[in-house]
């Protein structure tokens, strides 16, 4: 004769509680480890138009910032990196002086989905001279390049910080003077929140007038987006104040501000 043994309700309850505790502990451990993992940033430097000699200096500076601020940089010029399985590895995609058409239609769609689902974007300088026929990107970067002064193209100008509470500006002087190639912009996205205005009476060649944005952010497309117009020169990436500006922009994009 066989005897069936019913489970004691107390022991069943205790077993379930212990199992739940262990599973919860594993989940918490995984979350804690993920939180400790350095943020991953993809720095995209593909150019099909003008190529800035400052790109390499910019990549080097961003990697150095990563060592200080706790993020890792992967630099690529391969548009095939814009695949859903690859994009999901990164918390931020940064366009460093990219120019003209850099992604095909499928890659554009993958990037749109990445941003719509909360991925972050940051653009430096000629990121505004990129993908003129892609409306989503135009809104994402915030404005397109229209022109810049010539002979010389690099000029010293004064900027005015409009929002000193943002991570990208909180350590900047309210009146900031530096040398760079100052872009004039067109198709400015009305959703951008301007952080810094370029004072056109401080240099020659400005065409945007009294409202000449040079750094801004927005969150109108799903994820965080930040752009700064500086970074034409190699010297830019050796300036402590400009690097602090970039560091703050990255912190904002990563949500670590």
Where are the language model's segments positioned?
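N-terminal secretory signal peptides that target proteins for export/translocation
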Residues: 1-11
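Bacterial N-terminal signal peptides
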Residues: 13-25
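Boundary at the C-terminal end of the N-terminal hydrophobic targeting segment
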Residues: 28-30
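Extracellular ligand-binding/catalytic regions of CAZymes and related secreted enzymes
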Residues: 33-39, 45, 64-71, 77, ...
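Helical hinge/lid and interdomain linker segments adjacent to catalytic or ligand-binding clefts
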Residues: 40-130
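A glycine-rich, often tryptophan-bearing local segment used as a flexible ligand/cofactor-contacting loop or short
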Residues: 101-171
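Oxidoreductase and adenylate-handling cofactor-binding alpha/beta cores
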Residues: 137-141, 178, 185-192, 241-243, ...
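Catalytic beta-strand/loop cores that center a nucleophilic Ser/Cys/Thr
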Residues: 150-222
